[in-house]
């Protein structure tokens, strides 16, 4: 699940097939993630934008609802191929926000059936503190599309109906990863209703 900065540096030096994804994002300022990426990212990292790459676009088939609906598995796989990703690659995901956004890509890769994916422990701040190299500017341009093919999902997508039907059941655990003030309903900058799902 986690890879340390030193382990990633060793993996880079090994020459094994690897793709690193920068998932930096800011819900309040959607363009801020790309600006952060262009300012500094791990050399060779692909930028994975929550709105553009990790969510269904308006009018496209979606696998879920919500503010950032999941794209279909097929659309997600097409994006992975477009950035040169292959089934043989180790994926490493990171962000600058405490894994808020790279955790989504980790889950989506598992949902696409890809086993070899890890979260960079501590994200870019820890990478830099460990002496990891960074570069600025745009990302790499793939020399050829990847051949990523969907596999049997390693993670399950659960519907809202299923969650509602199992509220209060010991068989279901809901984890709310938002800020404590949003969980308690004291502040809600994005959603029309404040608070959390009962039992979370």
Can you say where each PLM-predicted feature lies in the sequence?
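Cytosolic catalytic domains that perform sulfur/thiol-centered chemistry
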Residues: 1-199
